[in-house]
Regions:
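M16 family metallopeptidases and their MPP-like homologs
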Residues: 1-55, 61-124, 143-152, 194-210, ...
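Aromatic-residue-lined binding/catalytic grooves and analogous aromatic/hydrophobic interfacial grooves
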Residues: 124-128, 135-137
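Extended beta-strand-rich architecture
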Residues: 153-186, 197, 203, 216
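Short, low-order "capping/linker" segments at domain edges
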Residues: 182-191, 293
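Conserved small/polar residues in nucleotide/adenosyl-binding loops
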Residues: 359-361
Length: 361
């Protein structure tokens, strides 16, 4: 299969995506499979994707073992680059079931469980339990309906008929129950990645635009100076995550730890009295620019496809943009007091040198 991928495509990629609307909705988990090829290889690519999906083999135990080891090694190598993202996911995981599920699928808990699976396989010298789990997941995937996105030239679609089997069935899976643990992960890093998360809102909530603008104001108006310029971290900021309905603070490659969490708290207090019109205008411009950023024709089409999967219409996207533009300082102060004064959860990735200091955070 790898030889065929190299012959006809630029590779086949697969990833899971969790789509949510409100905290009361069940959410949806999608497996996204993508590839690209020349027009002349369009049919071969399509057939290869279907074959790879439907005819996956689980009898090559050594190959599965190797792939799991490669998967773990790549994720461990990415800790220094993505430590702030992993810390934010960990901090948010206690706030709601969506965050907890995302953490299990792509966070440090996923890496921890993968390493535990390898350790167990080595101990019992048997991969059958893992293979059984993979086969169960595979059977759920291939029995679910799927949607097709294709971006190509008109010529490639001439006389083309898609022959995808669409089995109308549902595979329901419960979301992960969040825990109340404050987690610190000890790594080989010489620095810290600090994160603090608060319960936020979904994209459809009227407060979502103000929270997005507030995140940018906090980053540019306070966190950059306090944590990067004065504290020596490589970066710091805040993020309004409408996928997991959380609001997050983070620092990146940070030589300090407890001082950073103090800075997060000070940033919240600063937002209640010190936001200027310039802060507001710059933040609105930044958020609108991210909404309006130009994409390639394929990128635009993919963007529309993903929004359609989430049942977000063009009208809703334009309304969201307008609500961002209409944000006032009073709106930012209101959402800061409403959401960022509640209970939060903290998480840290840090080296051994920080181990004792973590107990007091």
């Amino acid at each position: 299969i790898q030889a065929l991928q190299s012959s006809f495509t630029g590779g086949i990629n697969a990833s899971f995506k969790l789509h949510t609307t409100t905290l009361d909705s069940p959410g949806q988990l999608f497996l996204s499979i993508s590839s690209k090829s020349l027009d002349k290889n369009f049919d071969a690519m399509e057939e290869l994707i279907l074959s790879t999906l439907k005819k996956a083999r689980f009898d090559e135990k050594n190959r599965i073992w190797d792939l799991l080891n490669i998967f773990i090694a790549r994720n461990e190598e990415s800790l220094n680059q993505n430590g702030h993202i992993l810390a934010m996911n960990s901090a948010a995981s206690s706030l709601n079931a969506f965050s907890a599920s995302a953490y299990q699928m792509s966070g440090l808990q996923m890496l921890h469980q993968s390493k535990a699976a390898i350790s167990k396989m080595k101990k019992v010298a048997d991969a059958n339990e893992l293979i059984g789990t993979l086969q169960t997941i595979h059977s759920k995937i291939i029995s679910s309906p799927f949607k097709i996105f294709t971006a190509c030239s008109p010529k490639a679609l001439t006389d083309k008929t898609f022959e995808f089997e669409n089995i109308e069935s549902k595979c329901e899976q419960s979301l992960i129950v969040p825990s109340n643990e404050q987690v610190a992960w000890i790594t080989g890093s010489q620095v810290c990645y600090c994160a603090e998360a608060f319960q936020g809102v979904s994209r459809e909530d009227p407060d979502a635009p103000a929270l997005s603008v507030l995140a940018t104001v906090l980053r540019n108006g306070f966190l950059h100076t306090a944590i990067r310029e004065k504290g020596g971290a490589y970066g710091a900021g805040a993020s309004n995550d409408t996928v997991t309905n959380t609001f997050k603070f983070f620092s990146y490659r940070d030589p300090k730890c407890s001082e950073t969490f103090t800075a997060f708290k000070e940033a919240i207090e600063w937002s209640k009295t010190s936001i200027s019109e310039q802060h507001l205008e710059e933040a609105i411009l930044g958020v609108v620019s991210s909404i309006d950023k130009p994409l390639s024709p394929v990128g635009e089409a993919k963007n529309d496809f993903n929004f359609n999967l989430e049942n977000i219409s063009t009208k809703q996207r334009l309304e969201m943009r307008q609500r961002v533009i209409n944000c006032s300082i009073d709106d930012l102060v209101r959402v800061s007091e409403k959401y960022l004064t509640k209970d939060s959860n903290k998480s840290i990735l840090a080296g051994e040198a920080y181990k004792l200091s973590l107990i007091h955070i």
